[in-house]
Structure formats: C-alpha cells, structure tokens
C-alpha cells in the first residue's frame, strides 16, 4: 500500500509537473497533474503517460486505483480564471 506522498513523489520524479496535487486513502487516489508534456496529447494519451510512470506500483499491487485530471499549463491557467 502506498501513501499519498509516495504517489506524489513517483509522479513528480517521472513527469515534469508545473502543478501536482494528490489525495487518497492508501488504496484509491485522486490526482491533478499539470504538465507541459501533455501539450498536443489526448486525454487518453495523457492518462497513459501517467500510468506508465506508475506502472510498477500498479503491477506490484501497491497502488490499486488512481483517478486523474490532466491539464497543460495553458489549460490550468484558463480554468483558474
């Protein structure tokens, strides 16, 4: 089982993030990930990229479920007004 901070660190180490928030209960996590790496990618491609970063933790069973919102920096700025 992973802790929220561990999930955040793994994502941050594997993906350049302008903004990253992770919340969870040890089994299910939610993440808001803002990365310039998402520019030009579909929602599915973005999620696949995050899943790639976390693959070994999913495969080992340490991480069970992650729901995510993925945004480019421009999308994030626009959403915040």
Annotate the PLM regions.
Residues 23, 32-34, 69:
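Solvent-exposed beta-strand sheet faces enriched in polar/charged residues
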């Amino acid at each position: 089982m992973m802790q929220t901070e561990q999930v955040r660190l793994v994502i941050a180490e594997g993906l350049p993030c302008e903004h990253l928030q992770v919340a969870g209960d040890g089994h299910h996590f939610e993440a808001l990930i803002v990365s310039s790496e998402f520019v030009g990618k579909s929602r599915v491609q973005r999620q696949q990229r995050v899943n790639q970063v976390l693959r070994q933790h999913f495969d080992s069973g340490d991480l069970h479920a992650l729901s995510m919102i993925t945004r480019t920096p421009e999308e994030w700025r626009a959403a915040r007004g």
